[in-house]
Swiss-Prot record:
HAMAP family, per database record: ARC_ATPase
Organism classification: Bacteria, Bacillati, Actinomycetota, Actinomycetes, Bifidobacteriales
Complexes and interactors: Homohexamer. Assembles into a hexameric ring structure.
Residues binding ATP: G235, N236, G237, K238, T239, M240
The protein, known as: AAA ATPase forming ring-shaped complexes
One Pfam family here: AAA
Gene: arc
Matches recorded under NCBIfam families: pup_AAA
Gene Ontology BP terms: modification-dependent protein catabolic process; proteasomal protein catabolic process
Record key words, sorted: ATP-binding, Coiled coil, Nucleotide-binding
Species this chain originates from: Bifidobacterium longum (strain NCC 2705)
Family statement drawn from the similarity comment of this UniProt entry: Belongs to the AAA ATPase family.
Length: 521
């Protein structure tokens, strides 16, 4: 190989190396630039979050450069800071989140924070400011953010406030209170209730007549009752009656004259049923229970403003309105009862609003609640007698069920009830000693309730279903099957009597005070 060829080959190798070195140098330059960028990012000082309050000042110089300052709150510090020239001061809104650099210059605006402390609105002032309270009832005066400047905010609404509790950032729906008050139309009708014809007649007279015959009530200058109390032992239909009343009102009717003709106004009456979860109104924070009671009646007045009847149903009323000074609770009732009474017959009228309460312990309700003019009508829903029990069982034992050949449902109901109401030793639960020291026998019939009757029928049906599964055939409901269900209920009730507190048990079940219980062997 000649020298020329050697030189050419060397030149090619050097050019290849030079090209490789150039590429390596280019890659190194890019990596160096990337590293510098990363170092610059790591060396960038942190930005501080703050809440925008208002623009403090703004002007534009002869060169068109903006010079502005803004009032912000960072943590608990209230400051006036300069605004960067590239941030449009005219677009800064109260309540928005802004960013401050290390020199406390406002360099960026972001959307308002969607999380924060929640407060309840106690009062809306004429200038739009709000008095809000925390869970302990401590009041604070705050301003609205730009997003809430023209929002309709009412007493009792919930809002999110900024960390300094100076600005209302966002309004929230009052979902917590809606959980306590259920606005519904129950599916229970009076036809679904057996054995309570007298009680149903009384409550229909008290609740339905005033709303469906308003012209007659006005003609006789008769005002409808403000409230109805359903009381008596548990499981006998108090809540079902209230639901049936609500169903009847919600279905609506026409305001009629005395002769049954529709009044000239042809007013269509359609009611609203507000079901209040009584025990859930109790709150450990002072004033919170009273606020919830005010909200309940406020909602009732709003629904009744158009002339439609509103029923406020309070179940377990004794848990909410206990006798003041009784010493059987934490004395929270000393403020709850007056608040309830002031809503019931205070300055603001309760036209078209009726309160229906249900309780197993009427002896624990404050007497001021029970006096005439408040809960005017008091209806005792007691334990069913024999004929009433048969009417109740007839609702659950019907002819469309698989029955024993040659026996109709009503006959089975009668056999079942007579077995339950027997006073032989086989239905003897226990012996009880009254306060006068006398002992007497207690039978299953003495503690029977509508709920127990339904439970016995359900036991028999469950037995029939299980036997049908085993045999593959429809097993009929027979007298022996019903008798076995009664026996099961009797044994469970008898066994439970050994563990009850005699005094409390007798009061809850509407009996005379009992000192001791001696169970049957």
């Amino acid at each position: 190989m000649s020298d020329t060829e050697d030189l050419a080959a060397l030149n090619d190798r050097l050019m290849a190396k030079n090209h490789a070195l150039a590429e390596a140098l280019s890659r190194a330059g890019k990596e160096l630039t990337k590293a510098k960028s990363q170092l610059a990012q790591l060396a960038q000082p942190p930005l501080t979050f703050a809440t925008m309050v208002k623009v403090d000042s703004t002007r534009t110089d002869e060169d068109g450069i903006q010079h502005a300052s803004a009032e912000v709150i960072s943590g608990t510090r209230r400051m006036v800071v300069p605004v960067a020239s590239n941030v449009n001061a005219a677009r800064l809104t109260a309540g928005a989140t802004v960013m401050l650099n290390e020199k406390l210059v406002l360099v960026e605006q972001r959307d308002a924070d969607t999380v924060g402390q929640i407060r309840s609105v106690k009062q809306v002032l004429d200038d739009g400011r709000l008095i809000v309270t925390d869970a302990s009832g401590n009041p604070v005066l705050i301003r609205r953010s730009g997003a809430l400047a023209y929002a309709g905010i009412n007493q009792g609404d919930r809002i999110i406030v900024d960390p300094s509790v100076r600005l209302a950032i966002e309004a929230l729906p009052a979902e917590g209170d809606k959980d306590l008050v259920l606005e519904e139309t129950p599916d229970v009708t009076f036809a679904d209730i057996g054995g309570l014809d007298s009680e149903i007649g009384r409550i229909r007279d008290a609740v339905q007549l005033p709303f469906q015959h308003r012209a007659l009530f006005e003609r006789y200058d008769l005002k409808p009752p403000k409230g109805v109390l359903l009381y008596g032992p548990p499981g006998n239909g108090k809540t079902m009656i209230a639901k049936a009343v609500a169903n009847a009102l919600c279905e609506g009717g026409y305001d009629t004259n005395g002769d049954g003709s529709i009044s000239p106004a042809e007013t269509h009456v359609k009611g609203v049923f507000l079901s209040v979860k009584g025990p859930e109104l109790l709150n450990k924070y002072v004033g919170e229970s009273e606020r919830l009671i005010r909200l309940i009646f406020q909602r009732a007045r709003e629904r009744a403003a158009d002339g439609n009847p509103v029923v406020v149903f309070i179940d377990e009323m004794d848990s909410l309105l206990r006798t003041r000074g009784s010493g059987v609770s934490s004395d929270v009732e000393t403020t709850i009862v007056p608040q309830f009474l002031s809503e019931l017959d205070g300055v603001e009228s309760l036209d078209n609003v009726m309160v229906i309460g249900a309780s197993n312990r009427v002896d624990m309700i404050d007497p001021a609640v029970l006096r005439p003019g408040r809960l005017d009508v008091k209806i005792r829903v007691g334990r069913p007698k024999t004929n009433q029990a048969i009417a109740i069982v007839d609702h659950y034992l019907t002819d469309d069920l698989p029955l024993e050949d040659g026996v109709d449902a009503h006959a089975l109901s009668a056999v079942l009830v007579h077995d339950i109401y027997g006073t032989s030793e086989r239905r003897h639960l226990c012996d009880v000693q009254e306060e006068n020291g006398q002992w007497h026998a207690l039978f299953l019939a003495d503690v029977v309730s509508g709920a127990m009757l339904k439970n016995i029928v359900d036991r028999a049906k469950t037995r029939a279903v299980k036997e049908s599964i085993e045999t593959g055939l429809d097993v009929a409901l027979t007298v022996p099957l019903l008798a076995a269900a009664v026996e099961d209920e009797y044994r469970e009730t008898r066994d439970s009597m050994a563990d009850v507190d005699p005094e409390q048990w007798s009061r809850i079940n509407g009996m005379d005070p009992i000192r001791r219980i001696r169970t049957a062997e």
